[in-house]
Amino acid sequence: MDRYQRKIGCFIQIPNLGRGQLKYVGPVDTKAGMFAGVDLLANIGKNDGSFMGKKYFQTEYPQSGLFIQLQKVASLIEKASISQTSRRTTMEPLSIPKNRSIVRLTNQFSPMDDPKSPTPMRSFRITSRHSGNQQSMDQEASDHHQQQEFGYDNREDRMEVDSILSSDRKANHNTTSDWKPDNGHMNDLNSSEVTIELREAQLTIEKLQRKQLHYKRLLDDQRMVLEEVQPTFDRYEATIQEREKEIDHLKQQLELERRQQAKQKQFFDAENEQLLAVVSQLHEEIKENEERNLSHNQPTGANEDVELLKKQLEQLRNIEDQFELHKTKWAKEREQLKMHNDSLSKEYQNLSKELFLTKPQDSSSEEVASLTKKLEEANEKIKQLEQAQAQTAVESLPIFDPPAPVDTTAGRQQWCEHCDTMGHNTAECPHHNPDNQQFF
């Protein structure tokens, strides 16, 4: 555990997440095992370094912290190395030679081996006219070499360094032109001024290098964010394609259900009309029989008439029972079809809402807008088809035509209104025919 604790502060490259800084190694409350707290340096984490109200480490952003099981990142932590962040902020003063010779400041630019930088870094050193008084800036060159591994050279920083060095050269040139061999005090002043200017130049260079590291860090963060967002865009596109396929399948299924529903409705309407016609005809026959019996004031107690009426009554009751059964059956099927249609409509609406919620933000927005427009046009077409089918279903119902004319007097005995007797009708009554010689 100590070897992991010593690596706190190092940077590790986590697969599928990017670069992060190790900031905690140890247990976490309510969780079994050891965990590593990593700051992902961007808002792509799950917390701010705290869990269940307890703070474990500080993060750069509110949602850049992440807890990972130690065994999953142990190999990454062991391979990581703690980067050297300390820099030299001071420089040793230049030694003044005993012969008080003029120190000249010359810039020698040497390219650094940085494959990422398009422009080589610049280093400078101080040389004397005499070889015994030469002093190089090796420490500062080593500082440049430590910083060059981070890449991404800053052009503005180089311009500022060049301006400082050019001012130093001008100052030294003026000092050289104004120097006189017998003025030792002036040489000391010029040497101290050169030393101060060199220190200021070094501080400025280090400040610019810190800015450069900061900019590189920001660029790395943006790159990681883009790498994390790209899979999300890919998932959005795949989800949109799946939703389009589901919508097409639901449209086909909905169209098929509507056709079947229209056919069943037409069939049940025709059957219902036929039953209503038969029932109304039977009711009319019953009324005619009742009126006829009342008009003649004759009891209907004859056995044959009673049996016939009972049979007719039973037939009417059976027909009414069948009618009620068909009516209830039709009502149930109509409710089932309605519920099925409502469920399909709700599912279609839910899929449309889900498609709206999963739209991406960049280049996919135009495709989502076009898909939304197509969905709206499809909904309008579906509404128009429903209205057209409802109108055609009502207008195209067939008129009931019985297969054969119904004889209202079928199965009844003949009755003569002239002589008020049974056995013959009025046209065949012998009392009504004057040419009949049987009666006189």
From Swiss-Prot:
Keyword set, alphabetical order: Cell cycle, Cell division, Coiled coil, Cytoplasm, Cytoskeleton, Microtubule, Mitosis, Phosphoprotein
Cellular component per GO, a single term: mating projection tip
GO BP terms in the entry: 2-micrometer plasmid partitioning; cell division; establishment of mitotic spindle orientation; karyogamy involved in conjugation with cellular fusion; microtubule nucleation; mitotic spindle elongation; negative regulation of microtubule polymerization; nuclear migration involved in conjugation with cellular fusion
Motif CCHC-box per UniProt: ranges: 416-429
Compositional bias per record (Polar residues), positions renumbered to this chain: 125-139
Region (Disordered) residue spans: 108-157
Residue intervals of the CAP-Gly domain: 26-69
InterPro entries the UniProt entry points to: CAP-Gly_dom_sf (IPR036859), CAP-Gly_domain (IPR000938)
Compartments reported by the entry: Cytoplasm, Cytoskeleton, Microtubule organizing center, Spindle pole body; Cytoplasm, Cytoskeleton, Spindle; Cytoplasm
Disulfide linkage: none
Coiled coil regions, renumbered to chain: 190-397
Pfam families found in the cross-reference section: CAP_GLY (PF01302)
Compositional bias segments (type: Basic and acidic residues): 141-157
Presence of keyword Cytoplasm: yes
Transmembrane region(s): none
Single GO MF annotation: kinesin binding
Residue numbers of Phosphoserine PTMs: S95, S110
Note: Present with 300 molecules/cell in log phase SD medium.
Database matches in PANTHER family: DYNACTIN 1-RELATED MICROTUBULE-BINDING, NUCLEAR FUSION PROTEIN BIK1
Its job: Required for nuclear fusion, chromosome disjunction, and nuclear segregation during mitosis. Probably required for the formation or stabilization of microtubules during mitosis and for spindle pole body fusion during conjugation.
Protein name, UniProt field: Nuclear fusion protein BIK1
Organism from which the protein derives: Saccharomyces cerevisiae (strain ATCC 204508 / S288c) (Baker's yeast)
Gene that this sequence comes from: BIK1
